[in-house]
Each structure stands twice: as structure tokens, then as C-alpha cells.
Regions:
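Ligand-binding pockets and gating/stacking loops
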Residues: 1-257
Length: 257
């Protein structure tokens, strides 16, 4: 039995290595001009590939090109059939989206990292006729407030001291988690193009003031676009587990094409 199991494992590994999905992971097969379109302006594809192939941690330090290569890989995988793909900018303490100082400058840099790759992914999938059956969701787990952390006259560890007159970008912290509003982008998958749903206040605290969306409704909208009932549940130990919270999610029909 153990020998048969081992042989089956080798057979499965051989099939996987020779499958279209395995070839999709080989980004060296992609024309250089295509790779460039997925990278921020000025980022050298050769340098990014060299970092990816190194063993000295260079790729872990490479930030500008990683998300772009992830989007390129996502497009290649969409062409061969995987049903669920995740691309992330990754969590690195006090870096990237963890904006504990220079928040507005950091946000501008992060937008530079994700802007071209996301746009090119959408364009490529549309050109290949894959966008109408692919739902692209760009989201984060929470928003940030636009002021520095802490309360007046209360000390916060390693807090940037903010003068009465702000003259330096580092004083814009964008520290605090903010749950009263946020933004999610949806592309393809049966959703409208160029459509804006909801509105936030013009002044702080910039809460949602029109068409608020609860997380279970966002999930229901995504499932509905994919042809899955938001009330679908699976029974585990005689208890129903719903794909949306308690099966209460309702699709936002206004965003559907």
C-alpha cells in the first residue's frame, strides 16, 4: 500500500509539473514588453527577475516590482483555470500600508506600486475575453484616519510630535484604524463600469453618509456576481455555516451590470 501511495504521489507530481498551471508560473516565458507594463515606471524587469531568483533575500527587499509580478502571474493563471487567486502587497511592520509616519507620502508611493499593475491586469483580461467571467476585487481590511495617533496631551509610544503649524509631511500620520468608511474597487464579473456607489462626508470624521455597505452585503454582492447564492450554507456538526454572516448578506443590485 505504501509503495502504491508513493507511486501515485510521483504520478500526481509529474502531472502537475507538466500542467498548463505549472507553466503559468514561469514568468520568463512572458515577453519583456508585457512585463514592463505590469511594473511601475522606471522599474527594471531584469533587476526584479534577478532579485526573484537570488537566495540572499534580495526579493524580500524588493518592493516596487513584486505586486506587479503578482498581477502578471494572476493574469497567466486566469488563462489556465484556477478559480481563486490572491495578490497582496504584503504586511511589513511600519512599512507599506502600515502608515505610522509620512502617511500621505507613503500612500502616494503605494498607489504608484499598485496603479499600473491593476490597470494592466484589467486591460489584459478584457483583451483576452476573460474579464466578463473574472471578478477583480481590490480591497483592504480597514481604512486609516488622516491625523496622527493619540489624544491631545497624551503620550503615545514613538509618536511623531506635531507642531501647531504643520510644515512637514511627516506630521501627517494616517495612524489610526478607521472603520466608519472605506473604499473597494470591483472590475469585470458582471459589475458596472465607472460606477460609484455610496458617499462620505466632506469633513472629518469623513463617515459614510449615503448608501452604507456592510461587509456581509459586500460578500453577498461578490458571491452573486459569481453565481453563488448568499444564503448558501454548509452543515458541520449539525450546525449551518453560511457563506455570508448568518446568511443575512444582500447583494447590492445597483452595482451589477
Amino acid at each position: 500500500y505504501q509503495r502504491e501511495s508513493l507511486i501515485r504521489s510521483f504520478d500526481n507530481a509529474h502531472r502537475l509539473l507538466n500542467s498548463p498551471a505549472a507553466k503559468a508560473f514561469d514568468l520568463s516565458l512572458e515577453p519583456v514588453e508585457n512585463v514592463k507594463r505590469y511594473l511601475p515606471a522606471g522599474v527594471d524587469p531584469a533587476r526584479t527577475f534577478q532579485a526573484a531568483q537570488s537566495r540572499d533575500g534580495a526579493y524580500e527587499r524588493e518592493t516596487l516590482g513584486r505586486f506587479g509580478l503578482g498581477c502578471l502571474l494572476a493574469r497567466r493563471l486566469c488563462e489556465v483555470g484556477p478559480r481563486y487567486i490572491v495578490v497582496t502587497t504584503e504586511y511589513i511592520p511600519f512599512l507599506n500600508w502600515d502608515t505610522h509616519e509620512n502617511g500621505h507620502t507613503r500612500a502616494a508611493d503605494m498607489k504608484r506600486q499598485i496603479d499600473a499593475p491593476i490597470a494592466q491586469l484589467v486591460l489584459d483580461l478584457e483583451e483576452r475575453g476573460l474579464l466578463n467571467r473574472t471578478l477583480i476585487v481590490v480591497a483592504s481590511e480597514f481604512s486609516r484616519d488622516m491625523i496622527t495617533e493619540g489624544k491631545p496631551e497624551k503620550t503615545v509610544k514613538d509618536q511623531v510630535e506635531v507642531p501647531e503649524k504643520i510644515e512637514d509631511l511627516k506630521h501627517y500620520g494616517m495612524h489610526r484604524h478607521f472603520t466608519d468608511a472605506g473604499s473597494v474597487l470591483l472590475f469585470g464579473g458582471g459589475v458596472k463600469k465607472g460606477f460609484l456607489y455610496g458617499r462620505t462626508a466632506e469633513e472629518r470624521p469623513v463617515k459614510t453618509i449615503e448608501n452604507p455597505v456592510h461587509i456581509e452585503d459586500l460578500h453577498a454582492t461578490m458571491y452573486s456576481a459569481l453565481g453563488i447564492s448568499p444564503k448558501l450554507s454548509y452543515e458541520i456538526e449539525r450546525r449551518p455555516f453560511y457563506v455570508t454572516r448568518d446568511g443575512l448578506g444582500k447583494p447590492i443590485r445597483d452595482v451589477m451590470a
